[in-house]
Amino acid sequence: MRIALSFALLAQLASPAPKPGHAAVIAAPADAAGAAGAKIDLFVDVTPKPGIHVYAPGNNDYIPITVKLAPQSEVKAGKVTYPKADIATIADEKVAVFQKPFRLTQPITLDKAAKPGSTVVLAGTVSYQACDDKVCFPPESAQVSWSVAVK
C-alpha cells in the first residue's frame, strides 16, 4: 500500500499540475461600432506571464494560439491576423513563439441587413498551449466577447 501511494505521489510530482491563466487574454475594444455592411477590426490582447511562451501558427508539431468566433448570423468573420512572432530555440529546434504582450486582429463584416440602433454581441474562444523553458502545460481556453453597435 505504501509503495503504491509513493508511486502515485511521484507521478503527481513528475507531471506539472495545470496552472490556469498562463496568459492574460482580453477582448479589445469590448465595445465597437459600425454601419451595416461595414468591416470592423476586433482585437484580442494577450500577455503571457513571465517565462511563458505560446506558439504562433505555422509550427506543425505544436498547438498554436487561435481565435474562434461563435457563429453569428449578423456577422461574417474574416481570417485572424497575427503579429510577427519571435523565433526561439526550444529543445534544439527553432520555432515561432509569442513571449511578450501581443495583439491578434479578428476582422468582421456586419451583415448589410443589420438594423441601425441594434447591438450585435459576439462571443469567441481563444485557445492556446502555454509552455516555459522546460515543459508545456495542458491546452487552455479563454472566453472573449465584444458588443458591436450598429449605426
Predicted regions and their residues:
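Sec-dependent N-terminal signal peptides
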Residues: I3-Q12
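Extracellular/lumen-exposed scaffold segments
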Residues: Q12-K151
